[in-house]
Amino acid sequence: MDGLPGNLVEPPPHERAHPVGNLDDLPRIMITAEEAYPVLEALFLRAREEVRMGFRIFDPATPLYSAEGRAVGRDWFDLVLHTLCRGVDVEVVISDFDPVVASETHRLTWRSIRMLTAVRELARAAGAAGRLRAVAAMHPARVAPAARLALYGNIRAEVRERIAWLGRMEEAERARALAEMPGLDRWIHGSGGRMRPVRWPVPDLVPATHHQKLAVFDRETLFIGGLDVNERRFDTKDHDRDAPQTWHDIQVLVGGREAADAHAHLGRFLDEVALRRPVAPSGGTILRTLSTARRFRGVSMAPEPAVAEIEEAHVEAVGRAERFVYLESQFFRSRPLAAAMARAARANPSLTCILMLPAAPEELAFEGREKVDMRYGEFLQARCLRKIRRAFGSRLFVGAPARAVRHHTDGRDTLRAAPIVYVHAKASFFDDRLCIVSSANLNGRSFRWDTEAGVTFADPEVIRAFRLRCFDHWLPDDAAPEARAPGSAVGAWTRLAAQNAAAPPQRRRGFVMPYEFEPGERFGRDLVAVPEELV
């Protein structure tokens, strides 16, 4: 490779050590795990007294990606152990999941808990002063018995799928899998080739999860956004990998009051959602979504929404936007937000909008999953996109990123003969006056049901710098100046996307492609009487 002496070959991205930068340069935006993971590792190494975290997924087997991290070990198992041995307390809440309908992530959670338990025992044996508290936290809300009874056949079918999967394993592997899914075993009768679903009672269903992704260090520094910690989520800014391995995400680093408030939130949210204490009022720095268990479930499938600060902030910001809105999200399925955007577009002929989405949901693009929940999600997104397209007209650009290489399949992992880049970021910009970075997607689940957390920025210089970093990530290096300016960006991105779509993949510039509306319109299906927050 050019620039390397002799026969040296540059190692692949997952093997290279990635730079950390100045941890005191705050606030800071990090694009992809290439930038974010080394920072998180360095923050652990710098922590003096305590680390408090809440993640949907936190896998201690995740490799370390910074030179600083690799100086103490190979993976997060080693880094957490090293941190405890330095006398730093570590507390982590990892989301647990419905063992029937989300058994894979349920298993991952308990595998992580077992690994962290081993870390704690090793630290104790070494005489470490630091204490580790690792909690697997399932949301306390449950689907009401009457609603579960109506879904009896569907639930038993899910259990049968798990039994079929277990039945294909050797006995030792099956025993290990069941041990790693402590919530599933109670819904299965028998063993080996004689397993069958329990007839009664109907298994519980857990409608919500703790979806937040944040870590606080010494109550002074906050790492927050859309990125969990596992090897699947590692990607670089050039996304130079197969489509199913791409993962575009955004995380920010802030200090001061936001860190202190996030620390307090992590210390109380489990009691709040379980109705063991009142939900704290907003502190003004951290935006949250919180829902609680229902005191009276009746026939409801839903938790009780308690705090919807992220949704409220988006709806209010859209109404106040004057010139430009820029959104990156995994989903765009919130009817209230789509309605607010449509109202704002009709009321203000000067308002423009860029919305960047993945070309398809992850499970549909890479796993071929076509169950009813996937169809319902696509139905909602297609409806929301229709609403804002009618209102904005040519003042709206909806994009989906793809790499500039040829790749063709019959599935939705391909966009115009190129591999898609999977978007998981959750960042929203309103003019250069407000920016929201959070764990919340633009859908009812994130806005009303799941536990979410985010921060806002109001400094125009900071917001502009963050927005330009987002723009420059997608745009080609030689993009025209109008592609970076709010007043002209929509037209410039629309033209660039059209040029890319018309060109062979290898001649395209940047990642910007037009989102294709027809596949979602065709695939989506409405579900009568099912709350949109389900997806």
What are these regions (language model features)?
Residues 1-535:
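Charged, low-complexity intrinsically disordered terminal segments
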